[in-house]
């Protein structure tokens, strides 16, 4: 217990970041609506390495069928280039997701393991705009996707923010 207390007190607030992404999409022609909320928290171990976790909630309504997905995705972030404004990084991690169709059968559980490249643009001392695009790795029933490969489509593009304390 004493070790945990000392370790907790030694964490500097300035090394913690929080943020996330939010998305909303509506297609009237296809009668489809989707919503995504993905908060994120992390800890900078050094100037190049960070550990973090992203939680996700996705809701999709398509052709009178509602689907909810919950996911947790811990990662290790390696920042391989940084100047005063731009930081390029790659997240290596794994995620677990469970998807449930409302009024449907059993939940579908899946996982992913892989790499996601990203960029952070520093807006001021505390706020950064963050974008991630692409995935290289393996998915098994993770958010309705399975298989091994690489993707870099607009469906993989996310924008968010980070606040560094």
Q: Where in the sequence are the language-model features?
A:
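Outer-membrane beta-barrel porins/channels
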Residues: 132, 141-143, 148
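Gram-negative (and chloroplast) outer-membrane scaffold detector with strong preference
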Residues: 15-16, 22-24, 35, 40-116, ...
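Sec-dependent N-terminal signal peptides
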Residues: 1-7
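Short glycine/proline-enriched turn or capping motifs at secondary-structure junctions
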Residues: 148-159
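Sec/Tat signal peptide C-region and signal peptidase I cleavage site
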Residues: 8-13
């Amino acid at each position: 217990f004493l070790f945990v207390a000392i370790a907790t007190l030694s964490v500097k607030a300035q090394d913690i970041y929080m943020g996330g992404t939010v998305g909303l999409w509506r297609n009237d022609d296809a009668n489809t609506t989707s919503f995504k909320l993905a908060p994120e928290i992390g800890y900078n171990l050094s100037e190049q390495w960070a550990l973090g976790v992203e939680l996700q909630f996705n809701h999709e309504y398509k052709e009178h069928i509602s689907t909810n997905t919950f996911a947790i995705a811990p990662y290790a972030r390696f920042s391989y280039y940084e100047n005063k404004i731009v930081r390029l990084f790659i997240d290596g991690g794994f995620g677990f997701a469970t998807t449930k169709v409302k009024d449907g059968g059993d939940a579908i559980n899946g996982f992913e393991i892989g790499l996601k490249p990203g960029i952070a643009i520093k807006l001021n001392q505390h706020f950064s705009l963050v974008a991630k695009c692409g995935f290289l790795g393996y998915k098994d029933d993770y958010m309705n996707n399975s298989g091994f490969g690489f993707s870099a489509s607009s469906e993989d593009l996310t924008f968010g923010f980070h606040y560094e304390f």
